């Protein structure tokens, strides 16, 4: 029984990995059909549906992986790092680095891969980025409590500016067909971003 569960779990992971790889390839700029995905995995469409009731559930699983990966690591950053600017830098670097290591998932994070899918999938990605922006805003607000001084501009504006930088770098990554890495020149860009906060 346990062996059967492991086989099923492995097949599910294989399907999700194939979908992520297709999103990374030139197929990712077009709608990915279950027929194409099944052919890529080497199974029938019926076999796909034994593991996932719909393509939407496949995307849900990939979004869940993105959410878990980012939120878990952001929480670790907030737990381990207390200095405001280091927290912000590490969170941005996390988002950019995750995208760089997972190009196919970057198409989901930017919404490119979801254009032909159910609206609620884009809603989940929107909620993820809203949560990240909220965490950035909280880090900025805690700076005032911790250091006794705030920022020249409103924390909401600053948090959205930082997140917009990340989103722009992810879009550039896709537009360049994954040639322009999101973390490229980050060490040069960070002081420019940090200067905007003061």
UniProtKB/Swiss-Prot annotation:
Q: Does the keyword DNA-binding apply?
A: yes
The primary site where this protein sits is: cytoplasm
Q: Does the keyword Cell cycle apply?
A: yes
User: InterPro entries, per this entry?
Assistant: DNA-bd_HTH_TetR-type_CS, Homeodomain-like_sf, HTH-type_TetR-like_transc_reg, HTH_TetR, NO_SlmA, SlmA-like_C, Tet_transcr_reg_TetR-rel_C_sf
Q: Which GO terms describe its cellular component?
A: bacterial nucleoid; cytoplasm
**Task performed by this protein:** Required for nucleoid occlusion (NO) phenomenon, which prevents Z-ring formation and cell division over the nucleoid. Acts as a DNA-associated cell division inhibitor that binds simultaneously chromosomal DNA and FtsZ, and disrupts the assembly of FtsZ polymers. SlmA-DNA-binding sequences (SBS) are dispersed on non-Ter regions of the chromosome, preventing FtsZ polymerization at these regions.
Q: Which family does it belong to?
A: Belongs to the nucleoid occlusion factor SlmA family.
Name of this protein: Nucleoid occlusion factor SlmA
- Species in which this protein is naturally found: Pectobacterium atrosepticum (strain SCRI 1043 / ATCC BAA-672)
Kindly list the organism's lineage.
Bacteria, Pseudomonadati, Pseudomonadota, Gammaproteobacteria, Enterobacterales
